[in-house]
Amino acid sequence: MNELQQLLLSGKPLHITTDGFRQAMLTAFPLSGKVEKPEVQNTLGLLSTDQLAYLADHTWYQLETHEALKKQLEAIRQDNSQPAVTLTDEYANEEIPENSIAYHRVWGTVMSDAYWFFSSKQLAADLMAAEANPQITCHFLHVNSPGGDAWFLDRLDETLRACTKPIITLYEHLCCSAGYYIACHGNRVYALTANDYVGCIGTMCSFYDFQPYFEKLGIKLIEAKADKSDLKNKTFDDLRQGKPEQYVDNFLNPLNEQFLACVRSMRSGLAELGDGAPVLRGETYLTAEAVTTGLCDGTRTFAEAVAEAVVMGAEYTEAEKTKRSIYNML
C-alpha cells in the first residue's frame, strides 16, 4: 500500500484510465480513517518527526494546509514591503497574537467529510473555533477547487453566514461549483491572476453504467423487491435507464435552488439576475468577465489580500470596541 501511495503522490505521469486512477486513489487514500505512521515519500517529502507528531491529532489534509501556510508566511516575510501579520491555522489557540487572521484552505475536490482531502465539516468546525477566539479578527478563505460534494454545503452556508468576523476570499486557478459555493461568502472575493476560472454555478450528477459490460461477460444482475417495495430505488433505476426526470425534479433541482439562493444573497451583482442568465446556468469565466458579471471583485496577490484582511480585521476590532463602549454607557 505504501508503494501505491508513493506512486500516486509522486506527480509522475501514469498510464492508467480515469476510472482506474479514481479507484486507486480511493483504495490508497480512503475518505476517512487515520494512519498511524505514513512512511511514504510524497509532495511533502519524507515526513519529519514534527510532522508525524502533528498527524497525531490532525488529518492529512490539515498537515498539507499547515505546510502550505508555512510557505506562504515565508514568502510574506521575505517581502519587506509587507507589515508583520499572523496568519494562523491554530483556530482555538488563544495564545496567538492579537488581530490574527484565520487561514482556511479550500484546495482540491470538496468532500463533506474526509481525512486525506478537504472536508466541509472540518471547515465549519474551524470557522466556529476561529469565531470563538478573541485573538482572531478576520477569516481568510484561500480557494483552488473545481467543486465536489453538494451534501453538507447548506450547513456550511449557515456557518459562514453566522460568522460575525469579516471574511475575505482569494482564489487561484479554479473556483468552480461547490468551490464557489464556499468562496462567495467572502465580503470581498478576489482572483489571483487574470486567468483564473470561476463560476460553474449549478448542480449535476454523473456516473458510469457498467451493467451492459458485465452482461457481455456473462455477469447478470439479479434483483427482486417485495410487493410493497415497488418504489425502492425506482428514481435511480429510472435515471440509469435514461429517464432522469424524477431524479432531476426531486434531487438536483432542490439542491440547485439552494445554490442559486446562496450566491444571489451573497453577491449583489447576481441578486437581480433572472434564471436565464448564463452565470446562473453553469457558465465559467476568466477574471475580467467574472468582475463584469459580479462573481468577483478584482485581482490581488496573496500578500495584498492578506494586507487587506489585516485592515478588515482592524476595522472589525474598532467596531466591536465602539459597540462595547455604547453598551457600557446604557
Question: Whereabouts are the PLM-identified features?
Answer:
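N-terminal organellar transit peptides
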Residues: 1-330
